[in-house]
């Protein structure tokens, strides 16, 4: 029997407030959608925007590209929503984001990249982490893509984006999610970059050349005495 999702309260975020701008300005993000029968060049931009949204700029590697999904999207065999699902469930996304993090971190990253908003609170993070632990990643991804929030904001043909990151009449907007939530948490980053001692021989003390004792230095006589009669010095 699966555990039902926990209830959690919502918090105030910019994306929950409708904008009152008369005309779209620079504060509104560019919308990448297939509703208007895009050309070949526009389809390339849509695919690139999907990769950038899901994998972020620092994960856009050639190994992350799925040419089969791209071909299906170009020939209208799948929707943008299906393309997003294929990227999130791909082995590349799993290796780069899930295998090196815990469920809480993975939930936060998926909500930011799929729903285009930040998590409401720790209760929401815990609720979705339980779904991953009890029902798996695919059920969690289906829950996000089939939610009313995703359908109302992006539908089947629009690439997700960070909603209302920039608001009119403000000096600066919110931090982009790829900078706010990097791929690795500090705990995993510390473990990953911990130096390991691979030298199996004895560890010798290193003394720089300029600090070595010269002729006439009392330290040389002390070493000579230790070499001649160490037992006498220890007993005394």
From Swiss-Prot:
Gene3D superfamilies: Phycobilisome linker domain. GO terms for biological process: photosynthesis. Keywords: Antenna complex, Chloroplast, Membrane, Photosynthesis, Phycobilisome, Plastid, Thylakoid. It comes from the Eukaryota. The keyword Thylakoid applies. It is a peripheral membrane protein. Residues 11-193 form the PBS-linker domain. InterPro entries: PBS_linker_dom, PBS_linker_sf, Phycobilisome. Belongs to the phycobilisome linker protein family. The phycobilisome is a hemidiscoidal structure that is composed of two distinct substructures: a core complex and a number of rods radiating from the core. This is Phycobilisome rod-core linker polypeptide cpcG. The gene is cpcG.
């Amino acid at each position: 029997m699966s555990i039902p999702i926990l209830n959690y309260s919502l918090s105030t975020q910019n994306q929950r407030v409708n904008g009152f701008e008369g005309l779209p300005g620079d504060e509104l993000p560019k919308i990448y959608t297939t509703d208007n029968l895009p050309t070949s060049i526009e389809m390339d931009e849509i695919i690139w925007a999907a990769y950038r949204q899901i994998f972020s700029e620092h994960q856009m590697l050639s190994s992350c590209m799925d040419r089969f999904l791209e071909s299906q999207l170009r020939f209208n065999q799948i929707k943008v929503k299906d393309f997003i699902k294929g990227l999130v469930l791909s082995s590349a996304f799993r290796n780069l984001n899930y295998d090196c993090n815990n469920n809480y971190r993975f939930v936060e990253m998926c909500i930011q990249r799929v729903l285009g908003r930040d998590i409401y609170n720790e209760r929401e993070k815990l609720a979705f982490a339980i779904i991953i632990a009890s029902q798996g990643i695919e059920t969690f991804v289906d829950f996000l893509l089939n939610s009313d929030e995703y359908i109302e904001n992006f539908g089947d043909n629009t690439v997700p984006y960070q909603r209302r990151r920039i608001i009119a009449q403000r000096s600066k907007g919110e931090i982009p999610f790829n900078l706010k939530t990097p791929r690795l948490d500090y705990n995993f980053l510390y473990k990953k970059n911990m130096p390991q001692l691979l030298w199996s021989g004895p560890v010798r003390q290193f003394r720089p050349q300029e600090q070595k004792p010269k002729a006439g230095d009392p330290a040389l006589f002390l070493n000579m005495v230790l070499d001649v009669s160490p037992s006498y010095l220890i007993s005394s």
